[in-house]
């Protein structure tokens, strides 16, 4: 049996075991226990950081650049339209069904096998493996908690499902709480100041404004009003109109820059829940990106968020599976996609 097949078989067995254990964000403990034990059984030395698992076996006198291999343990909650048990791994021909199989169990187990492979084969990088928690909710006990425990990282691969095409840029995210203020009064007497009417100009601006800097990889920065709450009953003029705005920033802006601009344009009060989920980009001339192109891959920009947003070092997403299957009913990954991923990673790192 060839090496790729052996590692693929191990990856699929591990993924099946992980699917059997519910690991919704903030409840990954049992899945992390299993993964930690399997890593020990492989003869490696994992370190637990809450529900994150770090494998860092570098030598202090090694001068090679350090590459982080990262993917997440946690899943979203299963949607109601599943026609299978989401926690029963099912193989049907080439498809492995189960919650988290595609997002991003395939990347999680594939990158671990690649780490194992390079324990006994030459690699131009020193590899560090991190299975992170709470990625789906950008939680405080996920990648952010593990980040200070990492060594100095030169570049990272994030194993999100990209069809094994390199996502070299990723949009950032801000969620804004926007509040228009008025003054309550009796609706029958035209008293007060209607906060809904006060919000109309701001709503119109949010709908129509187009940011000038358009990324060739990620397109424009986008704003969408997704939630509105106002009023308590029909005969009371509302004194507050509260809106939620979803902002997806391209890599030509920082979140802080966009927030300050929006605040300067709106009459309403604008507060960001967080600005830490920044857009990211790796230089297309980076050796790792060039190696991807040599192997026939096509770099692209990704609109979806990952732990890449929290990485203060060059990174790109590259993993088995398809983003379109993520968070969907009857989620699956192809066993052949896992095998292909392991083979491609090894080819990339052997000659980067």
Which ranges hold each PLM region?
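Short glycine/proline-enriched coil/turn segments at helix->beta-strand junctions
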Residues: 40-45, 50-51, 63-64, 120-124, ...
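Acidic/histidine-rich catalytic neighborhood of metal-dependent amide-processing enzymes
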Residues: 109-175, 179
């Amino acid at each position: 049996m060839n090496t790729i097949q052996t590692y693929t078989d191990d990856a699929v067995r591990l993924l099946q075991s992980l699917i059997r254990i519910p690991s919704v964000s903030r409840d990954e403990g049992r899945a992390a226990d299993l993964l930690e034990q399997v890593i020990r059984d492989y003869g490696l030395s994992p370190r637990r950081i809450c529900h994150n698992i770090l494998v860092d076996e570098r030598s202090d006198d090694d001068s090679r650049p350090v590459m982080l291999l990262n993917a997440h343990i946690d899943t979203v909650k299963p949607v109601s339209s599943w026609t299978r048990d989401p926690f029963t791994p099912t193989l049907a021909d080439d498809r492995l069904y189960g919650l988290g199989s595609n997002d991003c169990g395939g990347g999680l187990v594939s990158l671990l096998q690649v780490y194992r492979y390079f324990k006994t084969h030459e690699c131009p990088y020193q590899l560090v493996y991190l299975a992170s928690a709470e990625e789906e909710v950008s939680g405080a006990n996920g990648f952010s908690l593990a980040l200070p425990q990492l060594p100095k990282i030169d570049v990272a691969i994030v194993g999100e499902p990209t069809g094994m095409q390199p996502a070299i840029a990723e949009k950032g995210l801000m969620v804004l709480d926007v509040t228009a203020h008025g003054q309550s009064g009796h609706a029958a007497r035209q008293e007060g100041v209607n906060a809904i009417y006060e919000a109309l100009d701001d709503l119109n601006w949010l709908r129509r404004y187009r940011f000038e800097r358009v990324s060739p990889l990620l397109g424009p920065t986008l704003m969408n009003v997704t939630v509105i709450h106002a009023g308590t009953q029909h005969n009371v003029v509302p004194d507050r109109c509260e809106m939620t705005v979803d902002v997806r920033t391209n890599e030509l802006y920082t979140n802080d820059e966009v927030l300050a601009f929006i605040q300067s344009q709106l009459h309403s009060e604008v507060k960001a829940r967080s600005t830490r989920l920044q857009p990211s980009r790796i230089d297309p001339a980076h050796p790792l990106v060039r190696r991807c192109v040599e192997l026939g891959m096509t770099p692209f920009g990704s609109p979806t968020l990952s732990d890449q947003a929290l990485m203060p070092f060059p990174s790109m997403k590259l993993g088995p599976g398809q983003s379109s299957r993520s968070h969907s009913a009857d989620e699956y990954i192809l066993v052949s996609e896992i095998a292909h991923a392991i083979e491609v990673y090894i080819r990339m790192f052997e000659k980067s």
